[in-house]
UniProtKB/Swiss-Prot annotation:
It comes from Francisella philomiragia subsp. philomiragia (strain ATCC 25017 / CCUG 19701 / FSC 153 / O#319-036). Belongs to the ClpX chaperone family. HslU subfamily. This is ATP-dependent protease ATPase subunit HslU. ATP binds at residues 19, 61-66, 268, 333, 405. One of its GO terms (molecular function) is ATP binding. ATPase subunit of a proteasome-like degradation complex; this subunit has chaperone activity. The binding of ATP and its subsequent hydrolysis by HslU are essential for unfolding of protein substrates subsequently hydrolyzed by HslV. HslU recognizes the N-terminal part of its protein substrates and unfolds these before they are guided to HslV for hydrolysis. GO terms for biological process: protein unfolding; proteolysis involved in protein catabolic process. SUPFAM superfamilies: P-loop containing nucleoside triphosphate hydrolases.
C-alpha cells in the first residue's frame, strides 16, 4: 500500500483517526515513504541506506500509541508494539530484547500465510464442497462380476455418471446458498494438535517454542470423524484444503524478507528504562535493557526458528512521556540511533471537541451506534459536546493528565444510567444537553476528592 502512498496521502489517512500532532504524522509518513524510495535504488546503494529511527516525546493520551496502531494498518508491513519495561538485561530472569524480533517474525509469517490463503480461497472452497458432497452423495461404483469386469454396458455407466454429476451440482448450489447449513453430517477432519506447555530456563524462549512445535507436529497427521453442521464443516474443511495448497517454505522465506526490508518495531515506554539523573547503583531493568537494545537498533543478526534475521533495515519508533526522565537520560549510544525527535503537544479543549466529533469512528459516533442496537436514538447538542470537552480538560488539569483517555472516563460516567436502562426505556429518543451533563457530572467535578476516584 505504501508503494503508491505519498507522505501527504499517509498524513491524510492518519488524520481520519487522529486529531492534531502533525509533526509526528509527518515524521512517520516520511519514514514510511523512505521505505519505498529505498527499494527503487540499485543494490549497492540500497544496502547503505538505513532507516532513520524516530523518538516520540509527549504526555500520555496524546496519540503516540494510536499513531503507531494506525500506521501498522496503513503500512501493510510486519509490525509489533512492545513495552520496553517488559524486558530485562540478558542473564536476568525475564524476556530478553531479541524476543522482539522473534515475535515480529511470527507476525510476518501469519501475515504471509493469510495472504497465501486469500489467493487459494476459491480453489479451497471448491475442494471443500467436493468433500462435503462426497459425504452427502457417495460416488457410485461400477458393479463388478466375480472376475473383475463391469457387468453394465459403458453407455449405462456414462449416463449414471452424468446423472450423479447433475445431482452433485444441484446439491453444490444448495450448499452455496446456505440451504443445507443446519444439516448434520459425519466427516473426517484433521485433529488439532494439543498445546503442550514446556517449561524452559529464562532467556531460552526460542528453544522452548521449538520443542512445542516438535511435540505438536508429532500428532499433526491424525484424523478423526466428527459430527457437525454443514455450515461448520465447510469452514473447517476449507481451512484444511487451503493449508494443503499453500507452500510453507515459500511463506517462511517471504516472511523473513518482509521483516528485514519492511519490519516496524514500536517501542513504547522507553522513558521508563532511562536511568534517572543523579541516581547511582545497579538497576537490572534500566540501563542494561538500553544496552541490549543497541545492537538491534544499530543492526545485528538475530536467530529465529524460521532462520536468521538482519535488523539493519528494520524501522524502530520509540516513544515515552518523559515526565520524570529526560530524553538526554537515555544512554548516548541509543540517543544517536534515534535521530528524529518529535514532540507531541498536550491536548487543549478545542482538541477534545474535535476528538469527540471528527474522527471516522469518533467516541460520540461509537456511543450513538452502540445505543442504536437497543433502538435508542442518541444525539448530542453542540454546547453539550463542548461541555464534555471542558470537563475532561478540567479534570485532567486538577487530578492527573491522562490526555484523550479522560474522554472515555467522562462519557462512561455520563451515559451510565442510559446504558443500563436502554433495553427498558419507553422514550427511545434521547438528546444530551448541557443541563443533563451538569446534573450528572457537575457535583463530581466540583468535589476534587470524588473526581479523583470516579473521573
Amino acid at each position: 500500500m505504501t508503494q503508491v502512498m505519498t507522505p501527504k496521502t499517509i498524513v491524510h489517512e492518519l488524520e481520519r483517526h487522529i486529531i492534531g500532532q502533525n509533526d509526528a504524522k509527518k515524521a512517520v509518513a516520511i519514514a514510511l515513504r523512505n521505505r519505498w524510495r529505498r527499494m527503487q535504488l540499485d543494490d549497492e546503494m540500497r544496502q547503505e541506506v538505513t532507516p532513520k529511527n524516530i523518538l516520540m516525546i509527549g504526555p500520555t493520551g496524546v496519540g503516540k500509541t494510536e499513531i503507531a496502531r494506525r500506521l501498522a494498518k496503513l503500512a501493510d508491513a510486519p509490525f509489533i508494539k512492545v513495552e520496553a519495561t517488559k524486558f530485562t538485561e540478558v542473564g536476568y530472569v525475564g524476556k530478553d530484547v531479541e524476543s522482539i524480533i522473534r515475535d515480529l517474525v511470527e507476525t510476518a509469517v501469519k501475515m504471509k500465510r493469510e495472504e497465501a490463503k486469500q489467493k487459494v480461497t476459491e480453489k479451497a472452497a471448491i475442494l471443500a464442497e467436493d468433500r462435503i458432497l462426497d459425504v452427502l452423495i457417495p460416488p457410485a461404483r461400477a458393479s463388478e462380476s466375480k472376475v473383475g469386469f463391469a457387468n453394465e454396458p459403458a453407455e449405462d455407466a456414462q449416463s449414471k455418471k452424468e446423472k450423479e454429476n447433475k445431482t452433485r451440482e444441484i446439491f453444490r448450489k444448495k450448499i452455496q446458498n446456505g440451504e443445507l447449513n443446519d444439516k448434520e453430517i459425519e466427516i473426517e477432519v484433521s485433529v488439532a494438535p494439543k498445546s503442550i506447555g514446556v517449561m524452559g530456563p529464562p532467556g531460552m524462549e526460542d528453544m522452548t517454542n521449538q520443542l512445542q512445535d516438535l511435540f505438536s507436529s508429532l500428532s499433526s497427521d491424525k484424523k478423526k470423524t466428527k459430527k457437525m453442521r454443514i455450515k461448520d464443516a465447510i469452514k473447517l474443511v476449507k481451512d484444511e484444503e487451503a493449508a494443503k495448497l499453500i507452500n510453507e517454505e515459500d511463506i517462511k522465506a517471504r516472511a523473513l524478507e518482509s521483516v528485514e526490508q519492511n519490519g516496524i518495531v514500536f517501542l513504547d515506554e522507553i522513558d521508563k528504562v532511562c536511568k534517572k539523573s543523579g541516581t547511582s547503583g545497579a538497576d537490572v531493568s534500566r540501563e542494561g535493557v538500553q544496552r541490549d537494545l543497541l545492537p538491534l537498533v544499530e543492526g545485528s543478526t538475530v536467530s529465529t526458528k524460521y532462520g536468521m534475521i538482519k535488523t539493519d533495515h528494520i524501522l524502530f519508533i520509540a516513544s515515552g512521556a518523559f515526565h520524570v526522565a529526560k530524553p538526554s537520560d537515555l544512554i548516548p549510544e541509543l540517543q544517536g540511533r534515534l535521530p528524529i525527535r518529535v514532540e507531541l503537544k498536550s491536548l487543549e479543549i478545542e482538541d477534545f471537541v474535535r476528538i469527540l466529533k471528527e474522527p471516522d469512528c469518533s467516541i460520540l459516533k461509537q456511543y450513538i451506534a452502540l445505543m442504536k442496537t437497543e433502538g435508542v436514538e442518541l444525539s448530542f447538542e453542540e454546547d453539550a459536546i463542548r461541555k464534555i470537552a471542558e470537563i475532561s480538560f478540567q479534570v485532567n488539569e486538577e487530578v492527573e493528565n491522562i490526555g484523550a483517555r479522560r474522554l472515555h472516563t467522562v462519557m462512561e460516567r455520563l451515559l451510565e444510567e442510559i446504558s443500563f436502562d436502554a433495553p427498558d426505556l419507553e422514550n427511545k429518543s434521547i438528546n444530551i444537553t448541557t443541563d443533563y451533563i451538569n446534573e450528572k457530572l457537575s457535583g463530581l467535578v466540583k468535589n476534587k476528592n470524588l473526581s479523583q476516584y470516579i473521573l
